[in-house]
Amino acid sequence: MPSRDFPRTVLLLLLILATACGGGSSPTAPTATPTGQQTSTPTATTLTLTGTVTNIITGATISGGVIEVGGETATSGADGAYSLTITASSTQSFSASASGYYTRQSSVSMTGTSVVNLQLIPNGDGFNLTLFDHLFREKGQKGTKRWTSQPTFEIWTQEFTCLETNSNGEACIKYQAKGTAPTIFETNVRNSIAKMGQLTGSALSGSPITTKTHSVGTTLTHNDWGTTVGTISFAYVTGLYGENNAGASGDPNNKIHIDYGANVYADQTIHLHEVAHAVGFRHPDGSNNMPQPGIMGPWPYQWTSADERLGRILYLRPTGSLTPDIDPTGTIIN
């Protein structure tokens, strides 16, 4: 029988149909949907916040203050008192505002305490936000830094010679113990420490003061100083360290060290300036470029009521506080 030629198109169609039929393969079973799995919903909690709203500087009660938590609001009365009930299942945003005051922003825990007394910062009454941000927030660019526990003040009884300085000569990076430091050095350190309660709203009153004597020839390095975390140490330094130099290095809640040169160790105002650095004060543009005179500058340094007022507020707010009055992430006000 003569062969029959099928057109190529027909052969291709037959091949496609055979493939589509699957050649007798078993069908794939549909994927089973899990049963019995339920998404848990957090249980809502009801919390009634109560308290009094006052001026952080004068202590006067604030009428008409608006407290807002998670969309719910309450207003303080003539006596500054407020009450606000919230029902929610998680941490809620919090704010407290009033005419003539900076708005306080934080968070509320639905399982926290129910009494929250609020101290708002006035736009006035001796508070200067520009100065506060300059002193404590790198001109408003960063959060504050302050001690959250009592530091230990450690006075070194030896004179230290500086064997090596940093590139600009302003800081000693290698020290060696010599003989006894002048008596007036320890006296001035103790006198400056005694003022720290005034500069921190009494937060750092009563911090322990110790002395440390190093064996002659002991060598120490910058950013270690042989001290423990939580220590503010003081040294009388000669050698390569500038006679007119004084400086504090380190960070609150870690360790801080202060050096005093041969021409400045007897100057009480310089001691106060450096200890103010140790508790959180700064001069980001240098001591001769301050918004107004005070303990940070310009020279000659002046201890002012503004320093005391703003230092107290620094320690009434959590470390990391942002301008104008925003608690750092994770802060719970109750």
Predicted regions and their residues:
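Disordered inhibitory propeptide/activation segment of secreted metzincin zinc metalloprotease zymogens
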Residues: 28, 32, 36, 99-107, ...
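A short, solvent-exposed beta-strand micro-motif common in secreted/extracellular proteins
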Residues: 90-100
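Metalloprotease/metallohydrolase-associated module, dominated by Zn2+-dependent proteases
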Residues: 252-266, 282-334
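Glycine-centered loop-to-beta-strand initiation motif
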Residues: 51, 76-87, 114-118
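Metzincin-family zinc-dependent endopeptidase catalytic domain
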Residues: 178, 182-289
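Structural motif
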Residues: 41-64
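C-terminal motif of bacterial Sec signal peptides marking the signal peptidase cleavage site
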Residues: 17-20
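Short, acidic Ser/Thr/Gly-rich low-complexity loop/linker segments typical of extracellular
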Residues: 60-63, 68-85
